[in-house]
């Protein structure tokens, strides 16, 4: 068993690597500036958590104390101008403190790219960070990867949103740059296997998927899997600045993230030294479309990061909306003066003869669904407790946790996939925090238009629904109580 530190635990790589490390019996310590962001993650109670800032001397020393292997999974790309300098300063501090703590090995996820091609500042920063980490004197395994194909990866999210939302794409030259994308599961496998890799000093290992393609082929391959028809028109000139503004306009990516990504697309990022295939013979990299399919299989509410904890208990309705990893989440929270069991009973008895809120609206939606070839609004629900797989009108129970939560998946005809989730969390001795999440994973531009067209209707329907649940729970007027 190794004592392992994972930095960047709240990120899409670190958060998925931790379960693999725990499965193999390692003691895992995670570090974050704000540990409350980790509290709702499924592995939170299985790890040691330290609140620390990797830019502060004492914080880094405390995080590395007693550690055998440290994963360095952070960089400052989204922090504005000067990120290159901050990356190197942070790496130097981490290396110095690792040496003082007698850390055996640092494992760092870097980026592919050959210096002879004139690397962009972002790619150059990633590689120079590896050299600065090597100053600590112990082993450094630097895994250089191309675009990672998986939910949360910024290059993949850019490909996803552009392909989903733009039927006819005007493509600059960078769209035809050669790349070697790698599936998220393969990256995690390489990272986990690097703990026991035999090697000394600074080892640079290039990792990639099984295919070398272009960014344009990444988009057309994604479209093929999603059943979307896309037309690409090549143009001779479209500056990185204009391209990044276009990406920012079309996708949820912030401009501070979009620009370094777009600028980096002019560099070929392919494996030149395939030694990883010999060093890790147990890992057989996926092809691009297999990696995309794996990412799409993960397109469900559980793939999203938890909602941020509310700063205060809401006396009235609090609404939060995010667009992340291909899913839009509209979250409503309300304090209810009732036990969490009463709140759970209230939302698990919705549907059937009890109905919902604004029943006429649900009936109208059911009639439209029936006309489009869907099942329509079936007045049905189990007579007792709901369980996974049960039908509740035009919803299917996808998951239920007794006394805590209910997740329903829509069986309506939709340009995408939709879910409705309710959770009850005890907030104090006399009340419960009721949370209602509506999720939608739009398919193509039609799905995006559908979501925004219905937004004006969402407010009265979903606001009324959560208030009705709160009223039923507070009054004790739910079906289960009436049967006692």
Model feature map: region roles:
Residues 36, 40-103, 112-115:
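NAD(P)H-binding glycine-rich loop region in Rossmannoid oxidoreductase-like domains
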Residues 447-484:
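A conserved amphipathic terminal alpha-helix motif
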Residues 90, 154-155, 174-195, 203:
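Substrate-positioning beta->alpha
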Residues 335-344, 348-415, 468:
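Glycine-rich portal/gate segments that line the openings of hydrophobic small-molecule binding cavities
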Residues 2-26:
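N-terminal Rossmann NAD(P)H-binding glycine-rich loop of SDR-like oxidoreductase domains
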